[in-house]
Amino acid sequence: MDTLKNAANYVGDKVQGATATASKEANKDVAKDSNQGVGTRLNAAGDAISDKVSENKHDAKAEAHKQGATH
């Protein structure tokens, strides 16, 4: 039963990590866009950093769940 739970959690964390990656990339594009205002660019840069932290967190959790599902 734990193997099934770990597998489901692995999939969920991989999806959340991928979502954070997509958001990070979109925010990086906004931060680099010279047509945007300085405030918008700074907010996007901060959001990209937050997304990177979230991405790393979910990837680490997914790896832990993967290990739990295979052992």
Swiss-Prot record:
Coiled coil: none annotated. Residues 19-71 are annotated as: Disordered. It comes from the Eukaryota. Induction: Grg-1 message levels were found to increase within minutes following the onset of glucose deprivation and rise 50 fold during the first 90 minutes of derepression. Residues 49-71 have a biased composition (Basic and acidic residues). This is Glucose-repressible gene protein. The gene is grg-1.
